[in-house]
Amino acid sequence: MIQDKAMVVIIGAGIVGCTTAYYLTKMGWRDVVVVEQGPLFETGGSTSHAPGLVFQVNASKILAEFAKDSVDLYSSLDLDGQPCWYPVGGIEVAWTQDRLEDLKRKV
């Protein structure tokens, strides 16, 4: 049954929309609806085209912790026993000495 009203309506079931709904319900909100234009995992937004890359190395300790928490959350999500997130790796290449020093600070 489709609801015709809700306290919170989130447009888009991408990472931002789903995360917003997740945390609102975790905080006790019960009247939250997520609206998506197409079938889940086949949506037209940027999340469905993203490779699953989350950089956990950052010069900012807060952003590094946020990335780690994101990976922990994404890793825990599943749909009927199937994972919803497939992590991939990445590499950053320093082409200059300044960039090398910047990368060293991030580690």
Language model: regions and residue ranges:
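Short, flexible hinge/linker loops that cap or flank conserved catalytic cores
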Residues: M1-Q3, K26, W85
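Beta1/beta-strand and adjacent pyrophosphate-binding region of the FAD-binding site
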Residues: I2-V16, V33
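Glycine-rich FAD pyrophosphate-binding loop
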Residues: T25-T47
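Short coil/turn connectors at secondary-structure junctions
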Residues: K5-A6, W29-R30, V88
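A secondary-structure boundary/capping signal
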Residues: I11, E36-Q37, A50, P87-G89
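Dinucleotide-binding Rossmann-like beta1-alpha1 core, especially the glycine-rich loop
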Residues: P51-V107
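Flexible, glycine-rich phosphate/dinucleotide-binding loops
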Residues: G17, F41, L100
